[in-house]
């Protein structure tokens, strides 16, 4: 049985005695972003209804205790459970309550099963006429544009006011988000039109009389609630808060008038008719006091999440035939970097490459929108062999720009002893010229439309990880696989390609030391000391080394573990993509300073829902009669194509040496 969801507005009230209650509208007759309409009058339910956290059925946080169908929707009252015993349940309940109270979670969503529905003319949406209500959830980002928390209040505020105790602060969350501008206008009393400007003393008297009137109105509101034995409802609370704010403004204004009265008494001067008219105009201009408050969203996201959210906005815009930039503004209001990155994806403005003809070489790498792309690249780098160079004490590869000639000396000249009057011999120096051209590595990651539309943070993580995984495997395999040869204009050769491997001598600790000595000897024979040497090996090989023990039961190679470490004083990088065959694995020693790396630091992203794909990591090119294609449109899938410009090359042949058939530690 399919469970549907609909979203609506929520008003939260907090009790000082820890009795957590939420009131709000669980369903409205307005269409959501999916263009569906859920008719409140068609609801079938039985109280109490489970109240869940983010639609997770294994994370209940309370019950719906009251539900009333009205013209505006289904008005609900929700009781959040509270426990005293420490544990995961208490942590979840406290987190849910604090998230709702602080405004981080601002929407309600109903889970239901459709019994009767019809197509809405001129729309892809459905109108659910009869439906069975299963659960209600608090959600972070609702699909309905109206589904936001309107206010967060404490009922204890009214209880304290009734007892004459100073009230606690009120936290308000604006419907547009944390970064929206909220303007509160308080009108102060002024003389009636047609009357002459009153003196300062008359103004003070009038304001004091107005204050008494408003204080009496506040007292009447509280008296009425006390006689009925009830707390203030939403309308009474708003009226009470407004009166309280106006009295505070009047008190400040009276204080200013009294200060002005003292100054006038000390500096009394004749006032002309023109000056009086000007003063009247100035006072009228100050009748309204406006205060604007803007809070900028400074939430620190996990690496790569900002880029994933920009990609999701691009996909949602395509799926729903809406402006992707507008979706980014509505979902992530205040997060300017995500909005700017979405705009960059929509306009297909590629991240500029570094070239020698560009006077502002580093300019394209600065800015909010490009920082999102760089953030994703920085998330991807530590997951690749290439990206681990230059981090955590590991030497860096030699970074070079694209299309710039690299001149290297391959052999030196000779000097000669020359006798008196004899001809001086000539000598010859050998040089080579290399240029790294930008080559593109690309792959396609596929996600379901349900994941794209999911508003939970975990959905953003799924998109980010799929985009990263699309590039990580190819980069690692082609960088280290000895069999990978260069394809002109397409891909670079592996740094081990064309270098003869050294067969491993055995499995024991002594054999390991002999193998290591053989690798070092290869560098010594070429007069190229591996001062920036780095070991590359599979994680299983590193694990086998860490498990080897000497006769005393101590670790034979204590500096290494399955995640890396050091071996004979040099750092170790492990990867699951380093070649491993039945005969054994490959272990390489790489002199990092002898490897050229060109990396512009950018990534290009495109998406489609109509393409047909070969769900294969080695697609036919061109396709044949036996090629099986999968339609993204037919299966509700979204394809993301990610591309990076990158290239590498050995500086010299002696930059690397490697072992083959390694089975260290095997029985």
Swiss-Prot record:
Molecular-function GO terms, alphabetical: peptidase activity
PTM per Swiss-Prot/TrEMBL: The prohead protease may be autocatalytically cleaved giving rise to the mature capsid protein.
One biological process term in Gene Ontology: viral procapsid maturation
EC number(s) on file: 3.4.-.-
Site label Cleavage, positions: 348-349
Keywords attached to this entry: Autocatalytic cleavage, Capsid protein, Hydrolase, Protease, T=7 icosahedral capsid protein, Viral capsid assembly, Viral capsid maturation, Viral release from host cell, Virion
EC class: hydrolase
Superkingdom: Viruses
GO cellular component: T=7 icosahedral viral capsid; viral capsid
InterPro entries: Peptidase_S78_dom (IPR054613), Phage_capsid (IPR024455), Phage_capsid-like_C (IPR054612)
Lineage: Viruses, Duplodnaviria, Heunggongvirae, Uroviricota, Caudoviricetes
NCBIfam families, per database record: major_cap_HK97
Pfam families referenced in this protein's UniProt entry, alphabetically: Peptidase_S78 (PF04586), Phage_capsid (PF05065)
Chain segments carrying region Prohead protease activity: 8-154
Name used for this protein in its record: Capsid polyprotein
């Amino acid at each position: 049985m399919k469970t549907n969801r609909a979203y609506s507005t929520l008003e939260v009230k907090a009790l000082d005695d820890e009795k957590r209650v939420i009131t709000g509208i669980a369903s409205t007759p307005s269409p959501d972003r999916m263009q569906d309409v859920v008719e409140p009058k068609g609801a079938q339910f039985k109280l109490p209804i489970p109240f869940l956290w983010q639609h997770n059925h294994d994370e209940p946080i309370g019950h719906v205790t009251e539900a009333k169908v009205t013209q505006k929707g289904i008005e609900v009252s929700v009781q959040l459970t509270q426990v005293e015993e420490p544990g995961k349940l208490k942590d979840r309940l406290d987190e849910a309550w604090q998230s709702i109270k602080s405004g981080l979670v601002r929407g309600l969503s109903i889970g239901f099963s459709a019994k009767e529905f019809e197509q809405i003319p001129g729309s892809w949406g459905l109108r659910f006429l009869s439906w069975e209500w299963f659960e209600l959830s608090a959600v972070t980002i609702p699909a309905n544009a109206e589904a936001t928390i309107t206010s967060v209040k404490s009922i204890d505020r009214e209880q304290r006011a009734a007892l004459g105790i100073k009230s606690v602060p009120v936290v308000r969350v604006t419907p547009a988000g944390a970064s929206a501008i909220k303007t509160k206008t308080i009108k102060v009393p002024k003389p009636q039109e047609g009357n002459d400007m009153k003196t300062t003393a008359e103004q003070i008297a009038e304001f004091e009389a107005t204050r008494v009137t408003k204080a009496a109105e506040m007292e009447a509101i509280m008296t009425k609630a006390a006689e009925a034995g009830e707390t203030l409802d939403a309308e009474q609370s708003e009226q009470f808060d407004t009166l309280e704010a106006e009295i505070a403004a009047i008190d400040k204004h009276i204080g200013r008038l009294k200060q002005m009265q003292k100054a006038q008494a000390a500096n009394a001067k004749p006032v002309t008719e023109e000056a009086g008219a000007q003063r009247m105009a100035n006072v009228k201009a100050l009748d309204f006091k406006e205060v604007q408050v803007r809070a900028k969203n400074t939430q620190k996201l996990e690496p790569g999440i900002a880029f994933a959210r920009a990609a999701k906005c691009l996909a949602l815009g395509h799926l729903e035939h809406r402006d992707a930039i507008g979706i980014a503004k509505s979902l992530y209001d205040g997060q300017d970097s995500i909005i700017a990155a979405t705009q960059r994806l929509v306009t297909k403005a590629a991240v500029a490459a570094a070239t020698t003809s560009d006077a502002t070489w580093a300019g394209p790498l600065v800015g909010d929108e490009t920082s999102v792309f760089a953030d994703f690249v920085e998330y991807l780098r530590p997951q690749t062999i290439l990206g681990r160079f230059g981090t955590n004490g590991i030497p860096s590869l030699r970074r070079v720009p694209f299309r710039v000639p690299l001149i290297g000396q391959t052999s030196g000249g000779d000097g000669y002893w020359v006798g008196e009057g004899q001809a001086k011999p000539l000598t010859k120096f050998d040089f080579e010229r290399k240029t790294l051209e930008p080559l593109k590595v690309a792959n396609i990651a596929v996600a379901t439309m349900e994941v794209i539309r999911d508003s939970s943070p975990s959905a953003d993580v799924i998109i980010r990880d799929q985009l990263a995984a699309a590039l990580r495997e190819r980069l690692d395999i082609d960088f280290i696989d000895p069999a990978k040869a260069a394809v002109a204009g397409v891909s670079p050769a592996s740094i081990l390609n064309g270098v003869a491997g050294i067969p491993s001598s055995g499995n024991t600790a002594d054999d390991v030391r002999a193998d290591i000595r053989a690798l070092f000897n290869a560098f010594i024979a070429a007069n190229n000391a591996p001062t920036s040497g780095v070991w590359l090996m599979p994680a299983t090989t590193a694990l086998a080394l860490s498990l080897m023990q000497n006769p005393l039961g101590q670790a034979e190679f204590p500096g290494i573990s399955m995640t890396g470490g050091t071996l004979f004083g040099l750092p170790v990088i492990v990867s699951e993509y380093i070649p491993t065959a039945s005969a054994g694995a490959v272990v390489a020693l790489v002199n990092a300073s002898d490897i050229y790396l060109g990396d512009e630091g950018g990534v290009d992203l495109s998406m489609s829902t109509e393409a047909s794909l070969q769900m294969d990591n080695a697609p036919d090119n061109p396709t044949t009669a036996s090629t099986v294609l999968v339609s993204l449109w037919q299966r509700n899938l979204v394809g993301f194509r990610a591309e990076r410009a990158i290239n590498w090359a050995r500086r010299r042949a002696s930059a690397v040496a490697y072992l083959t058939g390694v089975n260290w530690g095997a029985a």
